[in-house]
Amino acid sequence: VHPDRHAGPQAGHADRLTRITAVAPAVTFYTFALAIHIAAVVIAFGVTFAYPVMYAVGIRSEARSMPGVHRIQDSVGKFVISPFLGLALLAGIYLASKLHTWSDFYVQWGLGVILLLGALGGAFFAPRERKLAELAERDVAAAGSGEVSFSQEYKDLRKLVFRVGGVANVLILLTIYFMTAQTGA
């Protein structure tokens, strides 16, 4: 006969509580890290899906605002996207290490995409967004009080940034799918 059976209905309950409590902090921290990872991705990249709308509205109805739009993009890259990309990476490293999933496709894909997006942010988007601001400012100044007509140089660079941004957004969506489905796990 088990000794707890004679000690009443609550006997053994404290032991079970101790075992549950000992496991709970690890589960809670993992869940916290997962929430941080997801939130960091949403904060870092959510705005990038609004950029095409900002471009369209700016070009069509607020052409004089385009230098500011590009400066805002540059600042968002520095102060929102980059830091939260770093946080998503750190949380992802913890999650992959905790679950020992480094060899799974979705982890390798996610790591590759986050490193690529970080590199694109610093080496591609930031300098081109600053250049777009300069070109737009020049074109707005050249228009004087008349209608703004953007130069071909501005249009070509804006189109390039728009296309690369579109590819980046597709990579983000694919990564979300692969992570959710745990593709290759």
Give a label for each model feature.
Residues 16-185:
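Polytopic transmembrane helical bundles with strong interfacial aromatic enrichment
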